Every structure is written in structure tokens, then in C-alpha cells.
Amino acid sequence: MSDKIRTLQGRVISDKMEKSFTIAIARYVKHPIYGKFIRRTTKLHVHDENNEVQAGDVVTIRECAPISKSKSWTFVAVIERPKQA
């Protein structure tokens, strides 16, 4: 078994839950017939103990033991905050 801890980066799309938020992770896959690269999105629920993130932030998350039915990722750091107008 690998000792590496999986980490991912993505954009926060919802922070309306208590101690949790939803993140969208985009990836590009090649269409098997036409060869065009298509953007695919994965949505994950992430645990945030201190409620520090806001919608629009780009964050780093890491895999952890399951916290609930839908949460097995925990918040690590904010990489970028959206510019305020």
C-alpha cells in the first residue's frame, strides 16, 4: 500500500454547510473517438473544522479516514481568494 497522502486542488462552489464545503475539481479527458479534450468535473464534500473558506476560493485538500457518509477529505490550505470588487 502506498504511504503517499492524496492531495487535490479545486474551487469551492458552496460553503453553506456547517464545518463543510463542496469543491469542484476539473480534469480534462480525451474523447475516445473524436480526440477532443473534454472538461469533466468531480464534486467532493470536504471537512472544514474552523469554517475558514468562502465560495470561490481555490483550496488544497487531502484524503482522510471517512468523517461521514459523504466526507473523506479534509481542508489543508487556501491557495487563492477571489478578488473583491
UniProtKB/Swiss-Prot annotation:
Disulfide bonds: none annotated. Coiled coil: none annotated. Keywords: Ribonucleoprotein, Ribosomal protein, RNA-binding, rRNA-binding. InterPro entries: NA-bd_OB-fold (IPR012340), Ribosomal_uS17 (IPR000266), Ribosomal_uS17_bact/chlr (IPR019984). One of its GO terms (cellular component) is cytosolic small ribosomal subunit. The keyword RNA-binding applies. One of its GO terms (molecular function) is structural constituent of ribosome. Transmembrane segments: none annotated. The keyword Calcium does not apply. Signal peptide: none annotated. Gene3D superfamilies: Nucleic acid-binding proteins. CDD domains: Ribosomal_uS17 (cd00364). One of its GO terms (biological process) is translation. One of the primary rRNA binding proteins, it binds specifically to the 5'-end of 16S ribosomal RNA. Part of the 30S ribosomal subunit. PANTHER family: 40S RIBOSOMAL PROTEIN S11 FAMILY MEMBER, SMALL RIBOSOMAL SUBUNIT PROTEIN US17M. Belongs to the universal ribosomal protein uS17 family. This is Small ribosomal subunit protein uS17. It comes from Pseudoalteromonas translucida (strain TAC 125). The lineage of its organism: Bacteria, Pseudomonadati, Pseudomonadota, Gammaproteobacteria, Alteromonadales. The gene is rpsQ.
